[in-house]
């Protein structure tokens, strides 16, 4: 597997990042402010010092958190030091976030949808539930699938679907870790496959839409019905299947590769494989919720996630792939060029079909269990 390192300086933030070792390594960010953040490999912050002449202040509410609380606090502390804004993140899956934003449209309680696949952001943009903002990231990225042309959402990371396998469970059932979609139909995996519900999870919908691109819609549903015979359970969250496989509860979990790699980082014995026919990918997006009560802070947060400092940190601690040009990958991260992607797969195009496909999945598969 090959990895690459590229060095690039973003106009908004200059970063000098040394490799993390056993002792704290300084991360220095300079703009019109001075700041020192000391970070260890375990991502512990010892000191944050920063002064900004024009703090925004107030509160910022994020929906869908992406990272565990300790890692979020590193980011929130830095952002607060720069902007004087207290950040709160309410953890939820993409399905719950969509439902909540729609239910609150007359009196929004959140400011930013932070993460989840761009499928969710496209759906919200189609309903005019997000505010246009062409900030740092939007202007940085090329036209195409990575951003909305009107600025209603912008992609800030990539992720690819993979298979998480438990060596212990595989040995018990006498099977190998699957290397293709077709492998998942083998009766040897009966009751041993875990995947999220496409009705609740953007991860699972990315899987479903990828199969529809690869096989055709009707054929994808026929495939899923056959795979359903081997599925032990459908989870609500997209990262749960990888966690369950890593814990040895099931042989195979279908999740994003970065979530599986986080289990490997914990020292858990889990194998990561990719389907040889090709896999689908997500563009994780960010958008400002229409009617945000602190739009200035929301815009500052959107700009912040496109800083090289954030992009590098996000890849280092979460293995999600940066969209900012020149940000090299952390050791162990799987790049887009390292896997076979489904030819012609466009997550933005499939986002427009989400409601119809999810309804069909529920009728033909979900309600039949």
Task: Walk through the language-model features, giving the residues of each.
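Periplasmic-binding protein-like
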Residues: 140-143, 159, 188-196, 223-228, 234-235, 304-328, ...
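C-terminal motif of bacterial Sec signal peptides marking the signal peptidase cleavage site
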Residues: 17-19
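Extracytoplasmic ligand-binding site segments that recognize negatively charged/polar headgroups
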Residues: 61-73, 88, 92-96, 108-249
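Bacterial signal peptide processing site
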Residues: 21-24
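A bilobed periplasmic-binding-protein/Venus flytrap-type ligand-binding module shared by bacterial periplasmic
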Residues: 164-169, 209, 282-294, 313-314
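Short alpha-helix C-terminal cap/hinge motif
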Residues: 74-88
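A ligand-binding cleft/hinge motif common to bilobed small-molecule-binding domains
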Residues: 119-123, 246, 250-269, 318
């Amino acid at each position: 597997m090959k990895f690459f390192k590229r060095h690039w300086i973003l106009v908004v933030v200059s970063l000098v990042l040394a490799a993390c070792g056993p002792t704290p390594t300084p991360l220095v960010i300079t703009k019109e402010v001075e700041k020192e953040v000391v970070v260890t490999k375990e991502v512990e912050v010892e000191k944050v010092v920063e002064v900004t002449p024009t703090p925004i202040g107030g509160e910022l509410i994020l929906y869908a958190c992406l990272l565990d609380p300790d890692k979020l606090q590193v980011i929130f502390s830095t952002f607060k030091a720069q902007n004087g804004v207290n950040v709160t993140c309410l953890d939820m899956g993409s399905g719950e976030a969509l439902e909540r934003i729609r239910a609150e449209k007359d009196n929004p309680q959140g400011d930013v949808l932070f993460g989840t696949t761009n499928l969710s952001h496209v759906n919200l943009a189609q309903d005019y539930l997000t505010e246009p903002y062409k900030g740092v990231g939007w202007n940085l990225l090329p036209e195409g699938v990575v951003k909305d042309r009107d600025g209603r959402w912008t992609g800030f990371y990539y992720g690819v679907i993979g298979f998480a396998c438990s060596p212990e469970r595989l040995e018990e059932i006498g099977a190998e870790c699957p290397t293709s979609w077709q492998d998942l139909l083998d009766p040897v995996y009966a009751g041993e496959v875990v995947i999220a519900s496409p009705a609740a999870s953007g991860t699972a919908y990315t899987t479903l839409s990828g199969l529809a691109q690869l096989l055709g819609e009707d054929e994808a549903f026929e495939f899923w019905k056959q795979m359903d015979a081997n599925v032990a359970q459908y989870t609500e969250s997209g990262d749960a299947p990888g966690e369950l496989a890593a814990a040895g509860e099931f042989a195979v979990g279908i999740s994003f590769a970065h979530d599986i790699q986080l289990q490997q980082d914990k020292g858990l014995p889990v194998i990561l494989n990719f389907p040889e026919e090709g896999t689908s990918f997500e563009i994780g997006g960010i958008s400002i919720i229409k009617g945000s009560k602190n739009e200035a802070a929301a815009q500052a947060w959107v700009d912040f996630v496109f800083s090289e400092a954030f992009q590098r940190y996000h890849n280092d601690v979460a293995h999600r792939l940066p969209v900012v040009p020149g940000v090299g990958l952390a050791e162990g991260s799987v790049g887009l060029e390292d896997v076979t992607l489904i030819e012609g797969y466009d997550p933005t195009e499939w986002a427009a079909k989400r409601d119809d496909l999810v309804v069909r999945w529920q009728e033909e598969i979900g309600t039949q269990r």
